[in-house]
Curated annotation (Swiss-Prot):
Domain PH: 474-577
Keyword Cytoplasm: yes
Name of this chain's protein: Ras GTPase-activating protein 1
Gene: RASA1
Residue list for modification Phosphotyrosine: 615
Record CDD domains: C2_Ras_p21A1, PH_RASA1, RasGAP_p120GAP, SH2_Cterm_RasGAP, SH2_Nterm_RasGAP, SH3_RasGAP
Single GO MF annotation: signaling receptor binding
Tissue: In placental villi, detected only in the trophoblast layer (cytotrophoblast and syncytiotrophoblast). Not detected in stromal, endothelial or Hofbauer cells (at protein level).
PANTHER family to which the protein is assigned, alphabetical: RAS GTPASE-ACTIVATING PROTEIN 1, RAS GTPASE-ACTIVATING PROTEINS
Keywords of the record: Acetylation, Cytoplasm, Disease variant, GTPase activation, Phosphoprotein, Repeat, SH2 domain, SH3 domain, Tumor suppressor
Site feature location: Arginine finger: 789
Origin species: Homo sapiens (Human)
Annotated disorder: Mutations in the SH2 domain of RASA seem to be oncogenic and cause basal cell carcinomas.
Subcellular location: Cytoplasm
InterPro entries: C2_dom, C2_domain_sf, PH-like_dom_sf, PH_domain, Ras_GTPase, RasGAP_C_SH2, RasGAP_CS, RasGAP_dom
Length: 1047
């Protein structure tokens, strides 16, 4: 509460009043807070307080009040609410009044008596500021809170590894006032001079960048006496540093002052104030009203509304804050005019009335306003000061607000960073006994300050023609990606890769691509691959912000297809800080790309106390990229392979930690090993037992060891034209080179298949490759029942090709049914050993049959979605098996089902996350249902009913019988593409890299190829030519390497 002080320009007794706690008046060492002149003729009606014969009265509310008579002279009075009133000596008239100001204003009457009274309506209360004869109190020193209100991030928010979520910054943050650290537009050199003049490590300031208008820089003096500059991106009212989002620069300062380090072990400590106050925000005023278009980021406004401009976007659009409503959004520049620096900075605030008289302010409050309404206008008594007008039940009171030299505002002896802070304070605290500030009286007759001759018709027509498609300048790439949120949630968001400023910006949707949901400054990031094992889904990658000393914070993304994910990764890598140090080479230079293959084999003698279900986490440097499955026991065997391709150039080691699988959201790392890549001989596999170290005390227990096979390779890629002769030899229609490589590359079959497929796809010869290899496989097979059962180069190529081209078909055929299974709580369990007590197997069977009917129907209807080239290859398979086994009438059906169902549809049903059909793991009921559905669909595709092996599944047999004929028709129809279709799609592959990789395979197996060339008659000439070209390419590569070294 605050005692209202009477104010007049006439003489009379003086009263000092202050709201808040700990104020003191009347001491020569601590001057009075304020003085109030009271009219000599003021009527007083209350019990008199004898002895107040002199003019000095000081009142403080809450806390201790101290008054020394030396300053005010005889008759000084200290009044304190809720505290002690103490008077210094010097006169017998000194009195301590503990009740001063309880019922209203403490007022001294003309007779020298003191009265407690509520002021009449005719009286206006206004405190006097610095002009009243006493200097203002200096502002209290800024004291950062000791741990209070800083907030913590819940460990449970990151279930799958280190993760940064922009929501995590929404915690209470405190920072010094803006005027203590904001310097406006300032160049780098002057900023460094100001910090060095301050002379304290931990000193900082924020400035607007002189190189990038609209963005800011945090300049910081480190303990090493080095000034570091950190880029801050301002975007639509938010501020981003690295990838962290803050709603204000003050929040950013608070975060790096109290929550996180800016450099290792260093926080923001000492703000450096500018030499003089800075107010450089661009302001504009509406010259016409506007109503927003629904479902956009536009804002509606009135004529006369004032705006702060945050961002100037393309095509005349601006992102602003409406000072009247505090609403942020889009406006177009045609509807506004510039506001000059000479206009009051509070113009546009809903409570500010800069162009009305004192009498008009009274009239507004009494006619338009209600009790507890208020407004602020410039003071008539003291230019530069302000008056807060406030309506009570009986009168209108006013309080003087005085700006201070250090950009604060004083009212009633308290100091605030802004007038808005004063208003917020007295919305919560009583300004007068029993009263709080409530609604401001809005600005009336706004038209009077504007040019009424503006013709809006043409302006509105111009706005309708404007589009919002060009808010961002240099859009290198755009589209949808999945982004991982808190826990295990993934959300489909719209992304823009902005090339001019190296920013990845994301939005809720393409329709609302104005104010970002988030922004990542790629100049301080690196892109890392994410293995499928980490989240149980494919096509993932991560952006790691690495600029600051704090633990890396990470953004995870997933593409719908491998090609989409790879395309985004390559696009992002071109703008990442670490990639800029090694730009793409020209056609006459050698490119180098590194990769790492890890085989986590087994562990030995893990501590029994700590491990029952151990698994491994794999890190590149300190960034997690993969994990193994959990295995039981102290000597677990994993035998899992992990391939990390195109490593960022800063990767210099891999780390493997061992954790124990529990039901906790995140299992701690217990043991670890670390290996520098420089230890590995490039291109050669190593097989080694690594002794493990411990993150926790093991108390004399040996930590055990881990067997890892690793191969680190550095690909040297020459310009594409250097491989032209090599490519011609590979693409010969007889495929002699392909056959030879399949013979010698048994261990590298998957790698060989992926390289060959990309090369032939690039040349639009994938049908030649697949049909020829399939025909060869069929011709070499004697038993129809074992055709394509073994894993060969042909079957591996077919599987890879289907996954690469048939994703749309899989989603169309399966997604709806699988989503229903995920949502359903109804079991389909038929096995007696797995049924719950009192569970009705007939209900479960009915539910399973309903799912199967719907799913199979969708599959049958999706045949036209399969790519025509794939269907042509199926047709070639059917013709080949008919020619090989003319009397086997089911073979043409089963050869296609073996690929479509066994290697595509059923794997997608069993593991829908791996096909990006779902993002979350299925519940135990849903997982079991998926297994039963896959079993049933596979048997239908094989045209086989369930029998004695799984008798509990016999209830599905009627469904299989009734759909056999339709299945045969469906599979036959898939192959009904007799001619190879023309395709306009061009596969986006790095052909020179694939050719270089194939060349490295030839080099690695050159001895086997040489032996083979001496054995095979028809292929002998081709293989000897292959060996000669391989040797020639090796020599050219050495020449390029020498040239690069010279440069």
């Amino acid at each position: 509460m605050m005692a209202a002080e009477a104010g007049s320009e006439e003489g009379g007794p003086v009263t000092a009043g202050a709201g808040g706690g700990g104020a003191a008046a009347g001491s020569s060492a601590y001057p009075a807070v304020c003085r109030v002149k009271i009219p000599a003729a003021l009527p007083v009606a209350a019990a008199p307080y004898p002895g107040l014969v002199e003019t000095g009265v000081a009142g403080t509310l809450g806390g201790g009040a101290a008054l020394g008579s030396e300053f005010l002279g005889a008759g000084s009075v200290a009044g304190a609410l809720g505290g002690a009133g103490l008077t210094g000596g010097g006169t017998a008239a000194g009195v301590a009044g503990a009740a001063a100001g309880v019922a209203g204003a403490a007022v001294a009457g003309p007779s020298g008596d003191m009265a407690l009274t509520k002021l009449p309506t005719s009286l206006l209360a206004e405190t006097l500021g610095p002009g009243g004869g006493f200097p203002p109190l200096p502002p209290p020193p800024y004291l950062p809170p000791l741990g209070a209100g800083l907030g913590t991030v819940d460990e449970g928010d990151s279930l799958d590894g280190p993760e940064y979520e922009e929501e995590e910054v929404a915690i209470p943050l405190t920072a010094p006032p803006t005027n203590q650290w904001y310097h406006g537009k300032l160049d780098r050199t002057i900023a460094e001079e100001r910090l060095r003049q301050a002379g304290k490590s931990g000193s900082y300031l924020i400035r607007e960048s002189d190189r990038r208008p609209g963005s800011f820089v945090l300049s910081f003096l480190s303990q090493m006496n080095v000034v570091n500059h950190f880029r801050i991106i301002a975007m639509c009212g938010d501020y981003y540093i690295g990838g962290r989002r803050f709603s204000s620069l003050s929040d950013l300062i608070g975060y790096y002052s109290h929550v996180s380090c800016l450099l290792k072990g260093e926080k923001l400590l000492y703000p450096v104030a500018p030499p003089e106050p800075v107010e450089d925000r661009r302001r504009v005023r509406a010259i016409l009203p506007y109503t927003k278009v629904p479902d956009t980021d536009e804002i509606s406004f009135l004529k006369g509304d004032m705006f702060i401009v945050h961002n100037e976007l393309e095509d005349g659009w601006m992102w602003v804050t409406n000072l009247r409503t505090d609403e942020q959004g889009l406006i177009v520049e045609d509807l506004v005019e510039e506001v000059g620096r000479e206009e009051d900075p509070h113009e546009g605030k809903i409570w500010f009335h800069g162009k009305i008289s004192k009498q008009e302010a009274y009239n507004l409050l009494m006619t338009v306003g209600q009790v507890c309404s208020f407004l602020v206008r410039p003071s008539d008594n003291t230019p530069g000061d302000y008056s807060l007008y406030f309506r009570t039940n009986e009168n209108i009171q006013r309080f003087k607000i005085c700006p201070t030299p250090n950009n604060q505002f004083m009212m009633g002896g308290r100091y605030y960073n802004s007038i808005g802070d004063i208003i917020d304070h007295y919305r919560k605290e009583q300004i007068v006994e029993g009263y709080y500030l409530k609604e401001p009286v809005p600005m009336q007759d706004q038209e009077q300050v504007l040019n009424d001759t503006v013709d809006g018709k043409e302006i509105y027509n111009t706005i309708r023609r404007k589009t919002k498609d060009a808010f961002y300048k240099n859009i290198v790439k755009k589209g949808y990606l999945l982004k991982k949120g808190k826990g295990k949630r993934w959300k489909n968001l719209y992304f823009i890769l902005e090339g001019s400023d190296a920013q990845l910006i994301y939005f809720e949707s393409e329709k609302r691509a104005t104010k970002p949901k988030g922004l990542i400054d790629l100049s301080v990031c690196s892109v890392y691959v994410v293995h499928d094992s980490l989240f149980g889904r494919p096509n993932c990658f991560q952006i790691v912000v690495q600029h600051f000393s704090e633990e890396h914070y990470i953004f995870y993304f997933a593409g719908e297809t491998p090609e989409q994910a790879e395309d985004w990764m390559k696009g992002l890598q071109a703008f990442c800080n670490l990639r800029k140090s090694s730009p793409g080479t020209s056609n006459k230079r050698l490119r180098q790309v590194s990769s790492l293959v890890l085989h986590i084999e087994e562990a030995h003698k893990l501590p029994v106390k700590h491990f029952t279900n151990p698994y491994c986490n794999i890190y590149l440097n300190s960034v997690q990229v993969a994990k193994t499955h959990a295995r039981e026991g102290q000597n677990p065997v994993w035998s899992e392979e992990f391939v990390f391709d195109d490593l960022p150039p800063d990767i210099n080691r891999f780390e493997i930690t061992l954790s124990n699988k529990t039901k906790k959201s995140k299992d701690p790392d217990i043991l670890f090993m670390r290996c520098q890549l420089s230890r590995l001989q490039k291109g050669h596999a190593t097989d080694e037992w690594f002794l493990l170290s411990s993150h926790i005390p093991l108390k004399g227990i040996e930590p055990g060891s881990l067997r890892v096979r690793a191969r680190y390779s550095m690909e040297k890629i020459m310009p594409e034209e250097e491989y032209s002769e090599f490519k011609e030899l590979i693409l010969q229609k007889e495929l002699h080179v392909v056959y030879a490589l399949s013979h010698v590359c048994g261990q590298d079959r998957t790698l060989l298949a992926s390289i060959l497929l990309r090369i032939f796809l690039h040349e639009k010869l994938e049908s030649l490759l697949l049909c020829t290899l399939n025909d060869r496989e069929i011709s070499m097979e004697d038993e129809a029942t074992t055709l394509f059962r073994a894993t060969t180069l042909a079957s591996t190529l077919m599987e890879q090709y289907m996954k690469a081209t048939a994703t749309q078909f899989v989603h169309h055929a399966l997604k709806d049914s699988i989503l229903k299974i995920m949502e359903s709580k109804q079991s389909c369990e038929l096995s007696p050993s797995k049924l719950e007590k009192n569970e009705d197997v007939n209900t479960n069977l009915t539910h399973l049959l309903n799912i199967l009917s719907e799913l199979v129907e969708k599959i049958f209807m999706a045949s036209e979605i399969l790519p025509p080239t794939l269907r042509y290859i199926y047709g070639c398979l059917q013709k080949s098996v008919q020619h090989k086994w003319p009397t086997n009438t089911t073979m043409r059906t089963r050869v296609v089902s073996g690929f479509v169902f066994l290697r595509l549809i059923c794997p997608a049903i069993l593991n829908p996350r791996m096909f990006n059909i779902i993002s979350d793991s299925p519940s135990p009921i849903a997982a079991r249902t998926l297994i039963l559905v896959a079993k049933s669909v596979q048997n239908l595709a094989n045209l086989v009913e369930f029998g004695a092996k799984e008798p509990y599944m016999e209830g599905v047999n009627p469904f299989i019988k009734s759909n056999k004929h339709r299945m045969i028709m469906f599979l036959d129809e898939l192959g009904n593409v007799p001619e190879l279709p023309d395709t306009t799609e061009h596969s986006r592959t790095d052909l020179s890299r694939d050719l270089a990789a194939l060349h490295e395979i030839c080099v690695a197996h050159s001895d086997e190829l040489r032996t083979l060339s001496n054995e095979r008659g028809a292929q002998q000439h081709v293989l000897k030519k292959l060996l000669a070209i391989t040797e020639l390419l090796q020599q050219k590569q050495n020449q390029y390497t020498k040239t690069n070294d010279v440069r």
